[in-house]
């Protein structure tokens, strides 16, 4: 009799850059869990079909990355409270009754990584660039840290305004046009995927000062294009999304397996692996 190994995956497009299989393989080894975790490309307009096929083939759970987080939100039969508020899902799990529950662990991953770097969020002036699913997923956890203000800006201003309106009852949040921002912020978070293409958001470099911390949700070998730009314009610190990735992955693993892996050791291994490429 052959024992079936539980299957997990990450869906995205592009997905070649993903380190999720590496992370979850290390998590499994660390916690003595038997599972397989793969990276899967889904067509830009074909996430639902790909996810249905995965779960029909006895997939247990999956992570979801750009550009499918809002598709996953609509795909799930049930949502956790934080996923419902985020309006985006980065983790899906097949329940015993066959239904699919959607969760969002991005915000927890981001906040824990910022705090790990000793970034002070309480009383800080925070700028979030981008107003897609990645941004919406982290706003409530950021507001829970009690910043003095949280500003959202986006290429399409109406999307930023919609997000600000959605969360206005949760804390001091405002939306601003990219072209009107000329002041510096304490914490600048780039939630767009521009760095994957070596591009920059159309916002003034005046957002950075010698007291600023830049955080790019994207990651790569060395500085991302956004963080390089931040450092060139005086930002004191610049962090990429690798720690956020490990943090949200640990939350996902906990949802799937009921065990919380240690993130610090895995992050060190991942950074070493990434820089060695």
Curated annotation (Swiss-Prot):
Top-level EC class: oxidoreductase
One of the GO BP terms on file: chorismate biosynthetic process
Keywords: Amino-acid biosynthesis, Aromatic amino acid biosynthesis, NADP, Oxidoreductase
Single GO term (MF): shikimate 3-dehydrogenase (NADP+) activity
UniProt pathway: Metabolic intermediate biosynthesis; chorismate biosynthesis; chorismate from D-erythrose 4-phosphate and phosphoenolpyruvate: step 4/7
EC number: 1.1.1.25
Residues annotated as the enzyme's active site: 69 (proton acceptor)
Amino-acid positions noted as binding NADP(+) in the UniProt annotation, renumbered to this chain: 81, 130-134, 154-159, 217, 241
Binding positions for shikimate per the UniProt entry: 18-20, 65, 90, 106, 219
Catalytic reaction list: shikimate + NADP(+) = 3-dehydroshikimate + NADPH + H(+)
Family matches, as SUPFAM superfamilies: Aminoacid dehydrogenase-like, N-terminal domain (SSF53223), NAD(P)-binding Rossmann-fold domains (SSF51735)
Lineage: superkingdom: Bacteria
GO CC term (a single one): cytosol
NCBIfam families: aroE, PRK00258.1-2
Homology family: Belongs to the shikimate dehydrogenase family.
Subunit structure: Homodimer.
Task performed by this protein: Involved in the biosynthesis of the chorismate, which leads to the biosynthesis of aromatic amino acids. Catalyzes the reversible NADPH linked reduction of 3-dehydroshikimate (DHSA) to yield shikimate (SA).
Full protein name: Shikimate dehydrogenase (NADP(+))
Gene transcribed to yield this protein: aroE
């Amino acid at each position: 009799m052959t024992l079936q190994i539980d299957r997990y995956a990450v869906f995205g497009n592009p997905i070649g850059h993903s380190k999720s299989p590496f992370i979850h393989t290390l998590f499994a080894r660390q916690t003595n869990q038997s599972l397989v975790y793969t990276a899967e490309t889904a067509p830009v307009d074909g996430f639902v079909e790909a996810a249905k096929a995965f779960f029909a083939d006895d997939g247990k759970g999956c992570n979801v990355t750009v550009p499918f987080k809002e598709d996953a939100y609509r795909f799930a039969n049930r949502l956790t409270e934080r996923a419902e508020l985020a309006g985006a899902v980065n983790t899906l799990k097949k329940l015993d009754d066959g239904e699919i529950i959607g969760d969002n662990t991005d915000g927890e991953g981001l906040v824990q990584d910022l705090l790990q770097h000793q970034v002070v969020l309480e009383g800080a002036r925070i700028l979030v660039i981008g107003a897609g699913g990645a941004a919406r997923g982290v706003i409530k956890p950021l507001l829970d840290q009690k910043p003095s203000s949280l500003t959202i800006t986006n290429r399409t201003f109406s999307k930023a305004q919609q997000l600000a309106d959605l969360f206005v009852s949760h804390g001091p949040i405002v939306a601003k046009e990219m072209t009107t921002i000329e002041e510096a912020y304490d914490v600048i978070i780039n939630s767009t995927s521009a760095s994957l293409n070596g591009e920059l958001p159309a916002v003034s470099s005046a957002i950075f000062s010698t007291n600023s911390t830049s955080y790019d949700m994207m990651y790569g070998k060395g500085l991302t294009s956004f963080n390089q730009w931040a450092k060139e314009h005086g930002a004191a610190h610049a962090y990429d999304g690798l720690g956020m990735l490990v943090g949200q992955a640990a939350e996902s693993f906990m949802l799937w397996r009921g065990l919380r892996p240690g993130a610090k050791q895995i992050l060190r291994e991942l950074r070493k692996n990434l820089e060695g490429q």
